[in-house]
Amino acid sequence: GSNLRGVCYVLDEPTIGLHPRDNRLLIDTLRDLSGRGNTVVVVEHDEETIREAGHVIDLGPGAGLHGGRVVAEGTPESLAANPESVTGRLLAHPLRHPQRPRRAVAGEAEPGAPAWLHVEGVHRHNLDGLDVALPLGRLVCVTGVSGSGKSTLVRDVLYEGLARLLAQRPERGGEAKEGVAREGAAGVRPSSATRLRPRRRTGGAATEAAVLAGLCASIQGWGEVARVLEVDQTPIGKTPRSCPATYVGVWDTIRKLFAGTPEARMRGYGPGRFSFNVAGGRCEACEGQGVRKLEMSFLPDVEVPCEVCGGARFNAETLAVRYRGLTVSEVLALPVEEALEVFAAHPAVRHALALLQDVGLGYLTLGQRSPTLSGGEAQRLKLVTELARARPGEPTRPGVSAPVEAASGQRGRSSPHTLYLLDEPTVGLHMADVEKLVRVLHRLVDVGHTVVVVEHNLDVVAEADWVVDLGPEGGDGGGRVVAEGPPETVARVRRGSHTARFLKGFLRERGVQAGGRGKPG
């Protein structure tokens, strides 16, 4: 409502968390500000916003070491004609959907139908008596305008309800099962069900109604799920000691490789010598962190490279040992894509590094400090760690553990059927990164898991096997299911669903014919 002119407005990803309907309203507001004689500078990944801009500056061409320069600038049309611009390529040739054949979701009474999870009688915030069914072993998207109850359903009810039920599940030994973890807590690594953080146990068996009190009346079909895991964009660690190599589980193997070199054996060094977390081989001046923190009175603390090791983390004696011509410090400085070549002969390391490369994180260095990772990078690291546990070609069945190949390359651990919950995972992701994220989600489902995503991004919604749209509005005007089914079915809904209206045009433009199966029988 301001009539100011000559103002420079700077906005950093203002479309975060907005439904396509609200996104259109935001763009109209920005155009109005610009039309009044103001300058509007927006940092944005949203395709619609980029297409509406009068001038676009594209940085890249890649991420990390491969970026940092202006590769194109001008109108969106000129960007689309620039072969060096990844953004321009996706403007000229948007993603087509579905990228892979959609998994069939038959009704429960039909042969070959997947197991279903029924959440009944939800009473939470604006959800009043809601009943919803989700197919297991599928990629499920929960959509709706802001405030329609999506996060309440998925995080407050589905996650919390399954967490309580799984904590009550008896093991063979009679104890409650530890099958719950809210991934995203700093330093918490995805792991097998027996290593996950347990919920507080109640004294004795409780009825399901008592366990779910305050959430919903019942959750049917939860016995098919062995684990529930929320994967968010919070940092994987808050100290320089945490890095991609330690998080995905390859650093122990790399340390053993260094300990097995002739020089290390001659000096009597074991794997512990090449750890920056324990005394012996690390630089004691910085305790293996490579930096020292200077406390500034009345100012934020400042980190500077260690003056003793110069940021190498290890002492001179440890750095005298080389593996394929590289010191342990130089290995930590290797980008994933280069480390793949160095450790190509070691399946234990190659498998996890190849997954990092596949999801677009090949530019990260093995020793990059976790606090410097973006939210999207941290989230993909967590998903890669989960993928590294699942052996390709041997999918799980709901409720059944399948043999897997761990990051160590050894077979024998089990991959329990896991329900992954992600709340708007595309926040902060470029269109090219969204494509990579979708591939990761599909791979998790391909090995037998279930992925439930709260999302506004239509590139993700169009890839789902099943969509549940809440609404029709936010707050008191929402809280009910207005459409459900495969994306093509939801797109045919004519009334009550804002998502259907935008999804219909999106699917028409991206080469998908309207048509699909209906609601389960």
Question: Would you name each region that the model predicts?
Answer:
Residues G1-G521:
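Conserved phosphate-binding elements of NTP-dependent enzyme cores
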